[in-house]
């Protein structure tokens, strides 16, 4: 029995339907899109300060650069897979992708600033932070809001039902604090 084509974990297997929305952010492709975003925004930040004899990019050029991560898709995923097979370095492949796209956009003059003064860890830590933040904001919190709405509905329906709480001391009455906990997030 060949197990290479099997899911890596139950999340890719039997629970895939429950976590599909997270793939946009927490998959390898989602991480690579965030890495491209970090590299592009770093380039924009450097040129905005006219560093190294550059001048600020026009708004149109900034939008064309930002399209690199906004329109990130299968072509970029495939390009990165080919390049990473050679480099054996994920962030270096991202750097090469950005440089390649800069050339295609006619922005060769700033290509040398790609990844300037950055380590792979700089790019990765910012990218992981972006992916987790967006997964929480765009997938997890909306799902939590649905659960809280259902709990409110059930609470109203069962408002007369007594609920006892006890941890270590005497029994006391309680509520679940779902709304307050969500507000704290």
Model-derived segments and spans:
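Short, small-residue-biased leader/transition segments that mark boundaries at the very start
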Residues: 1-3, 178-181, 185
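A helix-coil-helix interface module used to build multimeric assemblies
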Residues: 4-177
């Amino acid at each position: 029995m060949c197990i290479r084509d099997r899911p890596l974990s139950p999340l890719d297997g039997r629970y895939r339907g429950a976590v599909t929305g997270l793939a946009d952010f927490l998959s390898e492709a989602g991480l690579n899109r965030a890495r491209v975003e970090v590299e592009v925004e770093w380039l924009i930040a450097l040129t905005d300060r006219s560093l190294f004899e550059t001048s600020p990019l026009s708004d149109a050029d900034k939008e064309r650069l930002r399209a690199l991560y906004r329109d990130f898709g299968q072509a970029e995923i495939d390009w990165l897979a080919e390049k990473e097979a050679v480099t054996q370095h994920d962030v270096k492949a991202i750097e090469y992708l950005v440089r390649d796209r800069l050339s295609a956009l006619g922005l060769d003059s700033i290509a040398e600033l790609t990844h300037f003064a950055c380590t792979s860890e700089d790019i990765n830590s910012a990218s992981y932070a972006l992916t987790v933040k967006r997964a929480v904001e765009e997938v997890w919190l909306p799902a939590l809001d649905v659960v809280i709405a259902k709990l409110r509905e059930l609470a109203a329906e069962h408002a007369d039902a007594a609920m006892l709480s006890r941890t270590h001391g005497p029994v006391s009455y309680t509520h679940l604090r779902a709304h307050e906990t969500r507000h704290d997030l």
